[in-house]
Each structure stands twice: as structure tokens, then as C-alpha cells.
């Protein structure tokens, strides 16, 4: 199984989620509103940046756990529908998942997703 985490622009959320909902068997997606900054922001920072001076940019984090064979399709859809070509489009992380346990039923593995 794979956990896919994506950091995207907020205005791309609807496009991405509409496309993801068309994937047969997609177990679901968790969406969080987050803030942060990337390399380009950090490169422009002065040597000493106080916490108050850092501008955090609003972003959306998508998280989904899928079977290995579904991971490429999910990644490709997120990349395709969140891409603008501009700095700050975001990142997609793919992480191996050793185990999943569904709390309500104690199911494990793929069945728990």
C-alpha cells in the first residue's frame, strides 16, 4: 500500500477532487488546510528571519492511502489537475505503508482501507 500526500494550491482543490472521485475503488481522501513556505521563499529570506517576518502561504494537503497498483493513477491525476506551471504548484509524496488497521472493525491491510 502507498500513502500519497500532496500539497497543492487551494484554488485547484475542486479540480483535483472531482478528478479523483472518478477513480473506481478510490477509498477516500483527507483534506487539510495548511500554511507553509518553500525553497523560493526561503532563498529570498534574510540571514536572520524572525518568526513574525515569515510569510506563510495557504495551501491544501491531500492524503490518501491506496493499493500499490492504484498509486500511479492517483499521482498522475493530482499532478495533472493541480499543475499551473508556476513556482509554488506544490509537491506529491509517495510513502510505503506497512499496515492499516480500521479501528471500528479491526480489519487490517487492504480491507481496512
Predicted regions and their residues:
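Positively charged, small/polar-rich N-terminal and surface patches that mediate targeting and assembly
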Residues: 1-113
Amino acid at each position: 500500500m502507498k500513502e500519497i500526500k500532496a500539497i497543492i494550491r487551494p484554488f485547484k482543490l475542486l479540480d483535483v477532487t472531482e478528478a479523483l472521485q472518478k477513480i473506481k475503488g478510490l477509498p477516500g481522501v483527507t483534506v487539510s488546510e495548511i500554511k507553509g513556505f518553500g525553497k523560493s521563499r526561503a532563498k529570498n529570506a534574510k540571514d536572520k528571519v524572525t518568526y513574525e517576518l515569515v510569510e506563510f502561504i495557504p495551501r491544501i494537503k491531500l492524503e490518501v492511502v491506496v493499493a500499490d497498483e492504484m498509486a500511479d493513477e492517483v499521482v498522475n491525476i493530482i499532478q495533472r489537475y493541480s499543475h499551473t506551471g508556476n513556482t509554488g504548484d506544490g509537491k506529491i509524496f509517495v510513502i510505503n505503508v506497512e499496515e492499516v488497521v480500521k479501528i471500528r472493525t479491526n480489519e487490517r491491510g487492504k480491507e481496512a482501507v
